Amino acid sequence: MPNGKNGNGLTLLERFIPDGLSNAATTLVDSLKINSISEKVRRRRRVVIKRRNIYGEQLADLANLYFRISSIPIRFWSKVDDWRRWEAGCFKMLNGDRFRVFASGKRTVCEEKLPGKSLWDHMNRGTLTRQMLEAAAHEIRRAHQFWNDEFDGPWSHGDAGMTNVIYNQRTGRARLIDFEIIHDKSLPATVRHADDLLVFLLDIVGIVPGQQWLPFALRFLNAYGNLDVIAELKNQLALPNGMAWIWWGVRTSFANPAKVKKRLEKLRDLTANLRRYRTVAVKRARQRRRASISCQEMSPGMPRASSRTLAISDKAKAASPGMPRRLPTKR
């Protein structure tokens, strides 16, 4: 097939891949179920049971070969024991304050089910909000601050898409799940962290409607807040070539490549000028809620003599200038 470029700067291969290979690639991804997932109730608490399939190790090795050939910096945990250790350890590190995780059998990890729904579900139902995106960004930033011996540095997820972010509407808290994938351990922490942001943002790029996607991306990046990582993200916002493009197709739900390319360009501009965007947003917020110059900090209780409340009270009690101070008395 010729590999020239059209007017939009897209190769002919990239134009035909969504139409010719999207269904096949989607089927392949769906069939690539390294682990099976089920739910049960144990001791009156619902648990998620993740079990490594019989051919899971071979499938993981096959996927890792594709990642390596395509220069995609992630891999599956192919060995069952390694996966169980990593899955349980990450879940406990991030969610062990409220929820338990335990091994059950040689190929199984059991995790208490987190309350809420994934941001992926909210996005597809049209119920995704900016508050949810802020909660996700705060949780990812929190997770990135944990030290991990496997990396000999800060931890990263490796697959931080919206399907793996659970949001609890009652508490307003987001939590991360699903730790089957790990980043290449040779990568610097900022590169790994930027890749986590990229994976999350590609869901927004591929699915969210035109008028919402950029404000959503801005809200997420502002809430994440680490400008060094966001600067590194700018270097990763370009459509890849060759076989790596198929994985990006999966990440963006095989959205139109021209649309993805245009949105990535806007994201690059956003990341390059995020500091300016944040300054403008802060100024607007200050203009909307200017503090009164007559308000003073005070402790609860009796108002001070100089306070505005007491001054108003005294003024209300004062006699009018035209009113005599005493009523006339009869003699």
Regions found by a protein language model. Give the residues of each.
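ATP-binding glycine-rich loop module of kinase domains
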Residues: 35-82
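Conserved protein kinase catalytic/activation segment
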Residues: 164-176
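Catalytic-loop of the protein kinase fold
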Residues: 150-162
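C-lobe/activation-segment region of protein kinase-like
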Residues: 179-277
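Juxta-kinase regulatory segment immediately upstream of eukaryotic protein kinase catalytic domains
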Residues: 2-29
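Conserved structural core of kinase catalytic domains
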Residues: 98-136
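Structural motif at the C-terminus of the N-lobe alphaC helix and the adjacent alphaC-beta4 loop
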Residues: 82, 89-98
